[in-house]
Amino acid sequence: MNSYRELIVWQKSMQLVRAVYLLLEALPRKELYALDSQMRRAVISIPSNIAEGQGRSTAKEFVHYLSIARGSKYELETQMLICIELGYFSSESAETALGLCDEIGKMINSMISKLSTKL
């Protein structure tokens, strides 16, 4: 693999960025510096850490950055569920983003498992 851009998990995480940014347009202004800001950072962290990890020299480093991306995925997923609970998003409007979160999480877990055998 020559580029992180070829990784399907990175491509899916970029789709997630777009889906979350579209969802965030529904947040009230009072959440601009709270949930909005936290969710933007969390969703951007996912493809960023996948890319950074893929660019590192060793499998151990890649696993480290994939673990950070996985943590950001869990953080984002929790924040989306909070938004649903507070009535900011409907379950239906968040369905695409939550589905991508599940898919990305499974891919990251699989990559970590495969890379860990090389350590």
Predicted feature residues:
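Short, C-terminally biased terminal segments at protein or domain edges
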Residues: 1-119
